[in-house]
């Protein structure tokens, strides 16, 4: 079996264009969580 290059070595593989539409991180698109959602996130994190 031939050794395969890691994804971060392949040129452009980390670009959002390669990963499909909407893969880029949009900073101003953050929505503020309500208190209930925040509590739910804490529960989910402990379950992982």
Curated annotation (Swiss-Prot):
Q: Supply the induction statement.
A: Expressed only in the forespore compartment of sporulating cells.
| Cellular localisation | Spore core
Protein keywords: Sporulation
Keyword tRNA-binding listed? The answer is no
* Main subcellular localisation: other
**S-S pairs:** none
The record's annotation in InterPro entries points to: SASP_SspO
Name the residue ranges with Basic and acidic residues bias: 28-40
Query: Which GO terms fall under biological process for this protein?
Result: asexual sporulation; sporulation resulting in formation of a cellular spore
Which Pfam family, any one, appears in the UniProt record?
A: SspO
> Superkingdom, according to UniProt?
Bacteria
| Transport listed as a keyword | no
| Disordered as annotated region, ranges | 1-48
User: Might you report a single GO cellular component term?
Assistant: endospore-forming forespore
Family according to the record: Belongs to the SspO family.
Matching entries from NCBIfam families are given as: spore_sspO
- State what protein this is by name: Small, acid-soluble spore protein O
Species this protein is from? Bacillus licheniformis (strain ATCC 14580 / DSM 13 / JCM 2505 / CCUG 7422 / NBRC 12200 / NCIMB 9375 / NCTC 10341 / NRRL NRS-1264 / Gibson 46)
């Amino acid at each position: 079996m031939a050794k395969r290059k890691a994804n971060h070595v392949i040129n452009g593989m980390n670009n959002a264009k390669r990963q499909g539409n909407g893969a880029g991180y949009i900073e101003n698109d953050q929505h503020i969580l309500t208190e209930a959602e925040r509590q739910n996130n804490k529960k989910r994190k402990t379950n992982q």
